[in-house]
Amino acid sequence: MGKIIGIDLGTTNSCVAVMEGGEAVVISNAEGNRTTPSVVAFKGEERQVGEVAKRQAITNPNTIQSIKRHMGTSHTVDVDGKKFTPQEISAIILQKLKKDAEDYLGESVTEAVITVPAYFNDAERQATKDAGKIAGLDVKRIINEPTAAALAYGLDKGEDHTILIYDLGGGTFDVSILELGDGVFEVVATAGDNRLGGDDFDQKVIDYLVAEFKKENGIDLGKDKMALQRLKDAAEKAKKDLSGVTSAHISLPFITAGEAGPLHLEMTLTRAKFEELTADLVERTMEPTRRALKDAGLTPSDLDKIILVGGSTRIPAVQKAIHDFTKKEPFKGVNPDEVVALGAAIQGGVLAGDVKDVVLLDVTPLSLGIETMGGVMTKLIDRNTTIPTSKSQVFSTAADNQPAVDIHVLQGERPMAPDNKTLGRFQLTDIPPAPRGVPQIEVKFDIDANGIVHVSAKDLGTNKEQSITIQSSSGIDEAEIERMVKEAEANAEADNKRKEEAELRNETDQLVFATDKAIKDLGEQVEEADKEKAEAAKEKAKTALEGSDLEAIRTAKDELSAVVQELTQKVYAKMAEQQGAEGAEPQAEAKQDDNVVDAEFEDLDDRK
């Protein structure tokens, strides 16, 4: 059985880890970094992922960032007339992480544990699983990010702990409360906001810069796409800088042009101003934190440790807010960017049998139920119920001789059905005619360990049953996923072919250059016939490089290589002959001298 890798598929950055020798280790990517930007760019037929895609985002409109915010929705991205779902874009990122893991391990990787925000609903979880499948990964488990962080933090802790995990990433926020003891990781409560993260802090800075520039120059940079991308990069950098210093200078020369010529943006952002701009965002994280504690029936004094996860927790105001609320210093012993991937790798180790004596008890983040008479949401499974779990309840018909019942499956906390998230609908038909309230319809909810929901309805009178596994609301069916899998594989092959072509062209180009240099350097030592032969082979290679026939390039390269080799061998043989002829006389003299020296040595030897 191969390794099960752990993947933190983040909004702004992603990370991959694996268990090695009983330890979870982060795998560096091909560029040598431990995290990979969750950015995908399309340039003609080529797909770029990570740092290389992020770097050219300013000039390439076909660059997609923060796609995780759209997981589980019907949102699509248009690239040159072709539509991509969030699952397909996420799959491209996952393919890159899979390839980096394979290069590191030296073996094929087909299985993974992928993390999601604890507050992801069923559609978002299913979409994440589909993305894995499209990328060629069998997703063995979907686990919550805070739970993964607790695994990475608490695997070697023997004593009982109650910990609060505060996870503020690039696009999502979660808070979870866990109890750790004897290898059992039990999630007691979870809360969060899937539309809050580091991107929102960046946006506050961007809005401020745009407003200040407009005040000064009368030009709205918010309408200039290229300027906005430069502002985004500058805002992100300033935010990071302000975690370590009290003021950051933002300098963007030639940001736009006015009537008098080019205009530059020069501004200093202080930490105090940044905290003023983002105070409402920090406060938005505290409401779910208070709710999670309340759901767990705990007070801040009951907490043993506070663990901060996600790059945005480096913001001093965030650390101060959590410290002021809990009256505890957050634990700094884990890398907030890597801890989730490490935890996912540990869960992979548990599933593979490499990690023993660890039990993970996660919870469902939102209540589940069905719509009943009057548009009411009737809950069957309450939020923060430990999963996997199963619950059933008996319902009846609302009208006489009702032949069928519609089962409207919902997820959320609101009392009325329309205010909650629809997970799916299905129908139980062929109910025998009977007065209202007589038929007995048993509705059963099952939630598996991935947090994915299965619902069935059964007429207890006839034993007729109908069931549904909730698909993501984006409505991608199995056939569509299979098509995407094949497309992703084809693109991976195309990427490899492009890489091979680039390498072949580079090698041929270098050989042409080396041939030119060799002919010049050797000069008169090359016979005219050999020179002409080499020139002809070189021109053939140059002509082949101008075309698109790879086989022709390969053939021309091989021919040129053989000609150059033959030419250099001839020259070196000729040079060796010349040196042999020139060195014959001095050699004879040396021999005479040698005899004298030998005689001396013999005398010395005789004396010994």
Curated annotation (Swiss-Prot):
PANTHER family the UniProt entry points to: HEAT SHOCK PROTEIN 70KDA
Any one Gene Ontology MF annotation carried by this entry is: unfolded protein binding
Q: Which conditions up-regulate this protein?
A: By stress conditions e.g. heat shock.
Q: Where is the composition biased (Basic and acidic residues)?
A: 490-508
Q: What is this protein called?
A: Chaperone protein DnaK
Which sequence positions carry the modification called Phosphothreonine? T172
Q: Which stretches are tagged as biased composition: Acidic residues?
A: 595-608
Query: Which stretches are tagged as biased composition: Low complexity?
Result: 576-587
Q: Which residues form a coiled coil?
A: none
Gene designation: dnaK
- Could you tell me which PROSITE patterns the record lists for this protein? HSP70_1 (PS00297), HSP70_2 (PS00329), HSP70_3 (PS01036)
UniProtKB keywords: ATP-binding, Chaperone, Nucleotide-binding, Phosphoprotein, Stress response
Q: Does the keyword Chaperone apply?
A: yes
Pfam families from the xrefs? HSP70
Where is the region Disordered? 490-509, 576-608
Q: Quote the function comment for this protein.
A: Acts as a chaperone.
Q: Which family does it belong to?
A: Belongs to the heat shock protein 70 family.
Origin organism is: Exiguobacterium sp. (strain ATCC BAA-1283 / AT1b)
